[in-house]
């Protein structure tokens, strides 16, 4: 019996019919607190890693090695005044930051941390994740329009065009995963990557989806960078053109909520990429399977987040027309062609996805 089963059985005896509700709330709170801590120290890791790439130290004054820097940053933002522009639409202006954070948290309901460790093991988990993650663009548009600023509105329009452009390519990449796994359940998608010729010989990582679906893997991850408006796709808040885009008129915690959503979405994209293409909680080699699955999932997420940061520190920002061209003229044709290729592949005698 697993730890979760033991807690569940004990709680049922103690609280009776109220236990399922209490247990759900406890799990949601635990996941939410862990995500907030991860965001705080992801920001520190980003500043440290970029500092090392620039041959400098990064934050190193607050606490030992700068470990308390995230706490200082949070306190600073909490103490700052939220200044609302006089021409802004009050309620829409205040709703937009909250609306951008809620979907970022909601996606975690269906992401499995290891076998049977998921908040809601729904059969349409992949569809749910895609739908919920698409809601964030409405918050960006709302923020840009409610601020009643031309810079904010330009940023919002850029965000709408960019997210729509790359969501289509991401959708086709997910169709490929659905075709090969035969399920929309994220736990079953991870399970579908745990068999095959290489997995049978103990080399699990060569059986994961990243290898047969390599173009889709690359397109999905790069599109994820664009979806989160990260560098080099950050024309939404291009400092040299439109200052901070849709966030230009926000301050204090309202401003912080946009950044919180951005970093949570980075972790979400990394978690989904690890789940769909990198075997989720599966160990890379069979002889390492004794290590808990959540360790491997966290390690994969950390590696993908480091790639996010490496890309930011390395590449210059694309022009707006270059971003649109990449989405419509490169990624979309590549994913459509690969859907056809995999379709024929699955119908041929060389089908490697036979259950």
From Swiss-Prot:
Keyword vocabulary terms for this entry: Cell inner membrane, Cell membrane, Membrane, NAD, Quinone, Translocase, Transmembrane, Transmembrane helix, Ubiquinone
GO BP field: aerobic respiration
Subcellular location: Cell inner membrane
EC numbers on record: 7.1.1.-
Reaction(s) catalysed by this chain's protein: a quinone + NADH + 5 H(+)(in) = a quinol + NAD(+) + 4 H(+)(out)
Membrane topology: Multi-pass membrane protein
Transmembrane segments: 25-45, 91-111, 126-146, 170-190, 205-225, 252-272, 290-310, 330-350
InterPro entries listed in its UniProt record: NADH_UbQ_OxRdtase_su1/FPO, NADH_UbQ_OxRdtase_su1_CS
Pfam families per the UniProt record, alphabetical: NADHdh
Entry's Gene Ontology molecular function annotations: NADH dehydrogenase activity; oxidoreductase activity, acting on NAD(P)H, quinone or similar compound as acceptor; quinone binding
Family note: Belongs to the complex I subunit 1 family.
Subunit structure of this chain's protein: NDH-1 is composed of 14 different subunits. Subunits NuoA, H, J, K, L, M, N constitute the membrane sector of the complex.
Protein's UniProt name: NADH-quinone oxidoreductase subunit H
């Amino acid at each position: 019996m697993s730890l979760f089963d033991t807690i569940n059985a004990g709680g049922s005896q103690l609280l009776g019919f109220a236990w399922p509700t209490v247990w759900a709330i406890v799990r949601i709170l635990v996941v939410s607190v862990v995500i907030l801590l991860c965001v705080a120290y992801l920001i520190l890791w980003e500043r440290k890693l970029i500092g090392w790439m620039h041959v400098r130290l990064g934050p190193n004054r607050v606490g030992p090695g700068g470990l308390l820097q995230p706490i200082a940053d949070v306190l600073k933002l909490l103490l700052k005044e939220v200044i609302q522009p006089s021409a802004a639409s009050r309620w829409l202006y205040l709703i937009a930051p909250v609306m951008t954070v809620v979907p970022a948290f909601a996606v975690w309901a269906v992401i499995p941390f290891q076998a049977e460790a998921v908040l809601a093991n729904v059969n349409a988990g992949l569809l749910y994740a895609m739908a919920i993650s698409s809601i964030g663009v409405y918050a960006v548009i709302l923020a840009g329009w409610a601020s009643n600023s031309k810079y904010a509105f330009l940023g919002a329009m850029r965000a709408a065009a960019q997210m729509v452009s790359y969501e289509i390519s991401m959708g086709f990449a997910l169709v490929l995963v659905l075709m090969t796994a035969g399920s929309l359940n994220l736990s079953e998608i991870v399970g579908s990557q745990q068999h095959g010729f290489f997995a049978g010989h103990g080399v699990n990582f060569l059986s994961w989806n990243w290898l047969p679906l390599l173009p889709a893997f690359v397109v999905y991850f790069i599109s994820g960078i664009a979806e989160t408006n990260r560098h080099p796709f950050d024309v939404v808040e291009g400092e040299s053109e439109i200052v901070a885009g849709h966030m230009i008129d926000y301050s204090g915690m309202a401003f912080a909520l946009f950044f919180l959503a951005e970093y949570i979405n980075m972790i979400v994209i990394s978690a989904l990429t690890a789940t769909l293409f990198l075997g989720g909680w599966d160990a890379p080699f069979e002889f390492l399977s004794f290590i808990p699955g959540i360790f491997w999932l966290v390690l994969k997420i950390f590696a993908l987040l480091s790639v996010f940061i490496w890309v930011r520190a390395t590449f210059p920002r694309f022009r707006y027309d270059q971003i649109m061209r990449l989405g419509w003229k490169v990624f979309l044709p590549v994913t459509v062609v690969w859907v056809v290729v995999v379709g024929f592949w699955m119908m041929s005698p060389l089908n490697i996805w036979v259950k």
